[in-house]
């Protein structure tokens, strides 16, 4: 009898990262910011799983908060997997760590990376006993990918959460989500937002509710509440909160609708 897929959420940084156990191996979906390796090892220790037991590391997109410790983990044995649509972006975040003089960052070793074509992703995942595929889902970034498991789990990285879809009509974000929703996912695992069980939760909210959410975020900003606390209080996606904050602080006398309009333009 085939072993059931197990999904472990590793809580050690501001990025949600996931360890997925197949019947013949394990794959890590995303990592954290450079400097979080010890915290990552501690999270693995709580699962009683050695880092060396991870077979592959898959990065949803090569922004610094998702690939920051990928090479550090790979140096312990796991292999970094880069999809063909991502090959030109592997070092996109190197300059970010250089500017902040982050000595903890180790650049990805190109000679040790395994490149996989999107069309071969099902065969690749099959090598570790996972039935599923890796899908190109641009929107948040051009190199964004999502991982779909036939058992209903969907890992999307920083693809804008479903509750924001009203803001992104006619955009690449909507196109990517439409493709994913055709698969009828059961659970969506986000890079920053709370995971969503689509069998029990409404995947999107009305525009009027978005207005209320933005107004609430604006009030917290006025009170000097940190972005982390705003996220905890509202449950909103980190990127969405950052977008609202940026629009609010850089546009004088802007109202809620003005912020939503600008976020929609940004998503095109």
Language model features: what each stretch is:
Residues 1-47, 145-159:
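Conserved beta-strand hairpin/beta-sheet module of binuclear metal-dependent hydrolase folds
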Residues 27-29, 58, 80, 153-155, ...:
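Residue-level marker for buried hydrophobic side chains located in beta-strands
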Residues 34-35, 131-214:
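Metallo-beta-lactamase
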Residues 35-38, 45-124:
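Active-site HxH/HxHxD metal-binding segment of metal-dependent hydrolases
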Residues 127:
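A conserved mid-domain beta-alpha-beta active-site/ligand-binding segment of alpha/beta enzyme cores
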Residues 178-187, 194-268:
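Accessory terminal helices/loops
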């Amino acid at each position: 009898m085939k072993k059931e897929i197990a999904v472990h959420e590793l809580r050690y940084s501001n990025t949600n990262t996931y360890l997925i156990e197949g019947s013949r191996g394990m794959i890590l979906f995303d990592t954290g910011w450079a400097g979080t390796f010890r915290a990552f090892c501690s999270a693995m220790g709580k699962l009683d799983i050695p880092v060396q037991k991870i077979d592959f590391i898959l990065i949803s997109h090569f922004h610094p908060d998702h690939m920051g410790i990928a090479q550090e983990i790979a140096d312990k044995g796991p292999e970094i997997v880069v999809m063909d649509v991502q090959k030109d972006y592997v070092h996109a975040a190197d300059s970010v760590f250089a500017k902040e003089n982050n000595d903890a960052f180790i650049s990805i070793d190109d000679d040790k990376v395994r490149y996989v074509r999107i069309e071969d992703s099902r065969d690749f995942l099959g090598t570790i006993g996972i039935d599923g595929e890796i899908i190109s889902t641009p929107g948040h970034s051009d190199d964004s990918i999502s991982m779909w498991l036939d058992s209903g789990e969907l890992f999307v990285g920083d693809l804008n959460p479903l509750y924001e879809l009203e803001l992104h009509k006619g955009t690449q974000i909507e196109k990517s989500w439409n493709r994913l929703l055709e698969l009828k996912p059961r659970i969506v695992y986000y890079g920053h937002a709370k995971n969503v069980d689509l069998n029990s939760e409404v995947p999107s909210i009305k525009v009027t509710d978005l207005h209320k959410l933005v107004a609430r975020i604006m009030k917290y900003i006025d009170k000097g509440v940190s972005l982390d606390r705003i996220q905890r209080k509202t449950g909103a996606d980190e990127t969405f909160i950052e977008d609202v904050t940026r629009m609010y602080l850089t546009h004088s006398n802007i109202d809620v609708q003005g912020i939503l309009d600008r976020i929609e333009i940004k998503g095109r």
